[in-house]
C-alpha cells in the first residue's frame, strides 16, 4: 500500500460517482410554489396608544437552496436549479440575479427591525419566504436517468397581525394563518381564513 510522508498507510481514495451526461433533458413534475412561515414571535399586547413590538421572531424553518438525488448519476446542482428556474421563470436569459441557483446562498434572517403600532391590540410578528420545490428526471441519450428533488426560494418578507382580527383574504396555507395559529391560538379570529383587515406585510 502507498505510504504518507510520515510512514502511515495512505487511505485508499473512494471512486467518485460517475457524473451524468452533459447533454441530457430535464422533465419536471409536481412543481410547487408557496409562501411558507419561517419564523414567528410570541404575541405581545399593547395598550391604548400602541407602542413598539419588542418580542423577537424565533426561527421555525430554514429556507434551503439544494438538490436531493434519489437515484442515478449525480448532476451539477447549479445546472439542475438553473433548469428549474427557467421552467418557473425565476432564472432568465440574462442569468440568475436572485441567487435561485446558489446552493451556498445564506438563509434570510427571520428577525425583523423594530415595528411601531399606533393602536391597542395583541400583535404577532412573523417572517416568510416564497419557496419553490419540484421533482425532476434527467435523461441522457443512452436512456440513463437521474431523479431527485430541487428546492429554492425567491423572496422573503415579514408581517404583523392582530390576534382578534381576521387577516384579509387569508387562505389555508398562508404564513399569516400559520403564525396566528402558532402564537394567538387555533381559535383566535386571525387564525381562520376569510375576509378581514389587511395584514401589515413588507417584502424585502
Identify the residue ranges that each predicted region occupies:
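Membrane-inserting effector segments that mediate pore formation, membrane fusion
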Residues: 54-108
Amino acid at each position: 500500500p502507498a505510504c504518507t510522508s510520515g510512514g502511515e498507510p495512505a487511505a485508499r481514495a473512494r471512486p467518485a460517482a460517475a457524473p451524468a451526461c452533459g447533454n441530457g433533458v430535464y422533465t419536471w413534475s409536481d412543481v410547487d410554489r408557496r409562501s411558507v412561515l419561517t419564523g414567528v414571535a410570541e404575541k405581545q399586547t399593547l395598550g391604548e396608544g400602541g407602542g413598539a413590538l419588542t418580542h423577537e421572531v424565533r426561527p421555525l424553518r430554514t429556507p434551503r437552496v439544494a438538490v436531493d438525488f434519489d437515484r442515478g448519476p449525480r448532476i451539477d446542482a447549479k445546472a439542475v436549479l438553473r433548469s428549474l428556474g427557467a421552467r418557473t421563470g425565476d432564472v432568465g436569459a440574462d442569468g440568475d440575479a436572485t441567487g435561485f441557483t446558489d446552493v451556498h446562498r445564506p438563509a434570510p434572517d427571520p428577525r425583523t427591525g423594530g415595528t411601531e403600532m399606533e393602536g391597542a391590540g395583541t400583535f404577532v410578528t412573523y417572517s416568510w419566504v416564497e419557496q419553490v420545490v419540484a421533482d425532476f428526471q434527467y435523461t441522457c441519450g443512452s436512456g440513463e436517468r437521474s431523479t431527485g428533488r430541487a428546492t429554492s426560494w425567491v423572496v422573503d418578507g415579514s408581517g404583523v397581525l392582530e390576534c382578534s382580527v381576521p387577516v384579509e383574504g387569508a387562505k389555508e396555507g398562508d404564513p399569516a394563518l400559520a403564525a396566528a395559529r402558532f402564537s394567538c391560538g387555533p381559535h383566535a379570529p386571525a387564525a381562520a381564513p376569510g375576509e378581514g383587515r389587511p395584514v401589515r406585510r413588507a417584502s424585502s
